[in-house]
Amino acid sequence: MVSERSSNQSHPLDYYMNNQSTDHHTIAEDLEIQLTENDKQRIKSISEQIEPLNHEGLLKYGANLQQKMSHFSHQILDDVQSKDMGPVGETLSQLMGKLKSVNPNDINPEKQSRLKRLFKRTKASINEVFSRMQSVSSQIDRITIQLEKHKDQLTKDVEFLDQLYQQNKTYFDNVTLYILAAQKKKKEILTETIPQLREKAHQTGNQMDIQATADMEQFVDRLDKRIYDLQLSRQIAIQTAPQIRMIQNVNQALAEKIQSSILTSIPLWKNQMAIALTLMRQRNAVSAQRSVTDTTNELLTQNASMLKENAIETAAENERGIVDIETLKTTQNDIIETIEQTLQIQEDGRQKRQVAEKELNELEKDLKQHLLAMRK
């Protein structure tokens, strides 16, 4: 069904995925329409392998194909479980974190918030910013290497899943042929074999002929159940197809996201940081030039002011005498006041001594009187 189908002829699984509303009856009809001559010959050959009343052969009919499909399902499950997408998401998150850790606005104080300027130095050294950018850039380069490995692995996974999808198509085609072959054999038994057995049993009335008819009817019932089992296997193949495509799409989206980050986000970040650093240097140069101009103007203003003050003070000093009249007056008043205070102090001392002498005489007289009184 696959090898001989023309390139412009859609595979039933592809048609099913693009037309989710298609029912099983329509799919079956499409399968019959798309059968090639080789498919019809294979159906005939497989149908002839079914021996009526051979229950062991019926049990093994299509079993090998179902075992391959079971192994195929486990293969898909193992592949999904072994490919943990967690590290990919973590690596992308790390990349976004590093890209956000150094923002061009952080370098430009004018674009920082008032609160941020309050708790952070207004101006950062160019060397500090450049060193920080180099450190982050090195970390981003290491993350980029990891992302490249993830992207390569995801690309390989997409190719591997595409191979699994093609295998699933092959399983679908084969199980469909087995179903059609079993249905062909069932129709042959119902329309030819059983009517012949019934006619023979009716004519002979032999109990063994009647039992042979019943056995054949039981065989048809078991054949019908086997067909149903194979239809379930085909349904698994139908459901597996969109699951494989879904995993492929997720892997492809992640690979594209990684490639976009490597080829777009990272170069854009580096360009913006280079531009921000250049603008910072320009701003610092303008600030330095402004500082030189302001300092020059300030020095000229201060020198002119000092020259004016010195000229005025020098002229005033030249007009003054060696000793000011006011100074002489103050000095003379201080001398006179000192002499007067000295004379007053001497007079006060003299008076105090006279009073002390009188008190001493009184004390001496009092002592003598007490001594005389003690002798009597």
Swiss-Prot record:
Pfam families: TelA. InterPro entries: Toxic_anion-R_TelA (IPR008863). It comes from the Bacteria. Belongs to the TelA family. This is TelA-like protein SE_1089. It comes from Staphylococcus epidermidis (strain ATCC 12228 / FDA PCI 1200).
